[in-house]
């Protein structure tokens, strides 16, 4: 079975082909970051138009990369949501039109399920069951995973997602879009313990997250440390970025440990754009070592939105649907 995957939920156009016998045989990705940078964030209408321009050419490139013809494709998976409505509509329309023309099934895939299963593409893939930490610009969730399609939401952000909080705080520091990535780089040069940020919602039971208060705390810290010219010196920027990042990471670690204790599981899977954060990866690895557990995450290119995770998830779903009963 060979599945074509199409991802168009936000500002990346991703197309990939997953082969049941060979694994991932094609992976094409186009990022719109440079286009949206001038606006300080994603402009939905521009995103949709760019997906229209890029999706079909990327499909042609993916088929060429895999040395396949349309007749070799057994199904098409596409991101059905969540995401930008117009962008999703582009991907779903193209996927369903091609599926009709090629006489193969089309399957809508939940964007976060794609992220959740992305670590399964690695050689050192996790076995079920596990706890998944899905952490991106739009979501921060802890999920109990017992198998494909067997998910239980344990906790999630009640306001800003972790990635969103990174981006907004980075913007307060005067960083260009995408500010979250730039802020993590700043944090590497920060002085530990100069600023003490709170660890929100860790003083009460439960597995939900809240990061909007950290953004407000950062705004107040920035205001209190402006010089006579109304600016922050570079080291203070680094120190604030470091304190903010450490607060987010510590909060996530506390919640992950609770989720593992609640489920009794020893495997933690992390996925989503923020899972590429070096500090988060290092601290989670250290925590899991102390807990005598394992942590898994995808390679950096599969942390952000991509077609590979959609193709693979579509393959797993269609394979399950085709199993004899």
From Swiss-Prot:
Catalysed reaction, written as an equation: L-threonylcarbamoyladenylate + adenosine(37) in tRNA = N(6)-L-threonylcarbamoyladenosine(37) in tRNA + AMP + H(+)
UniProt xrefs under PROSITE patterns: GLYCOPROTEASE
Domain of life: Bacteria
NCBIfam families for this protein: gcp_kae1 (TIGR00329), T6A_TsaD_YgjD (TIGR03723)
GO CC annotation terms, alphabetical: cytoplasm; extracellular region
Function recorded in the entry: Required for the formation of a threonylcarbamoyl group on adenosine at position 37 (t(6)A37) in tRNAs that read codons beginning with adenine. Is involved in the transfer of the threonylcarbamoyl moiety of threonylcarbamoyl-AMP (TC-AMP) to the N6 group of A37, together with TsaE and TsaB. TsaD likely plays a direct catalytic role in this reaction.
UniProt organism field: Mannheimia haemolytica (Pasteurella haemolytica)
Family the UniProt entry places it in: Belongs to the KAE1 / TsaD family.
Keywords linked to the UniProt accession: Acyltransferase, Cytoplasm, Iron, Metal-binding, Secreted, Transferase, tRNA processing
Protein name: tRNA N6-adenosine threonylcarbamoyltransferase
Pfam families for the chain: TsaD
Cofactor note: Binds 1 Fe(2+) ion per subunit.
Enzyme Commission number, as recorded: 2.3.1.234
Keyword ATP-binding: no
Residues at which Fe cation binds: 111, 115, 305
Residues involved in substrate binding: 134-138, 167, 180, 277
HAMAP family named among the record's database cross-references: TsaD
One Gene Ontology MF term: N(6)-L-threonylcarbamoyladenine synthase activity
Co-factor(s): Fe(2+)
Subcellular location: Cytoplasm; Secreted
GO biological process, one term: tRNA threonylcarbamoyladenosine modification
């Amino acid at each position: 079975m060979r599945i074509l995957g199409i991802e168009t939920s936000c500002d990346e156009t991703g197309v990939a082909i997953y082969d049941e016998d060979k694994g991932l045989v094609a992976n094409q990705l186009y990022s719109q970051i440079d286009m949206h940078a001038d606006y300080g964030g994603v402009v939905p209408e521009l995103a949709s138009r760019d997906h229209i321009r890029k999706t079909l050419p990327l499909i042609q490139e993916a088929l060429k990369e895999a040395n396949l013809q349309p007749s070799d494709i057994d199904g098409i998976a596409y991101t059905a949501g969540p995401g930008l409505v117009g962008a999703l509509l582009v991907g779903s329309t193209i996927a369903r039109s091609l599926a009709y023309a090629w006489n193969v099934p089309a399957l809508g895939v939940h964007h976060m399920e794609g992220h959740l299963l992305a670590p399964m593409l690695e050689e050192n893939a996790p076995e079920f069951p596990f706890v998944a930490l899905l952490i991106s610009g739009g979501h921060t969730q802890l999920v109990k995973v017992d198998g494909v399609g067997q998910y239980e939401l344990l906790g999630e952000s009640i306001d800003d997602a972790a990635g969103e909080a990174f981006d907004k705080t980075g913007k307060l520091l005067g960083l260009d879009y995408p500010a979250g990535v730039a802020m993590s780089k700043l944090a590497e040069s920060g002085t530990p313990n100069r600023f003490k940020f709170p660890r929100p919602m860790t003083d009460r039971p439960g597995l939900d997250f809240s990061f909007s208060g950290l953004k407000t705390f950062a705004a107040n810290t920035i205001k209190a440390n402006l010089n006579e010219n109304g600016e922050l010196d570079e080291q203070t920027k680094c120190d604030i970025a470091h304190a903010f990042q450490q607060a987010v990471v510590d909060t996530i670690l506390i919640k992950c440990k609770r989720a593992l204790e609640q489920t009794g599981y020893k495997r933690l899977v992390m996925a989503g754009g923020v899972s590429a954060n070096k500090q988060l990866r290092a601290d989670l690895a250290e925590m899991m070592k102390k807990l005598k557990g394992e942590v898994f995450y995808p390679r950096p290119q599969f942390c952000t939105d991509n077609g590979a995770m959609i193709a693979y998830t579509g393959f797993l779903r269609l394979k399950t649907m085709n199993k004899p009963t």
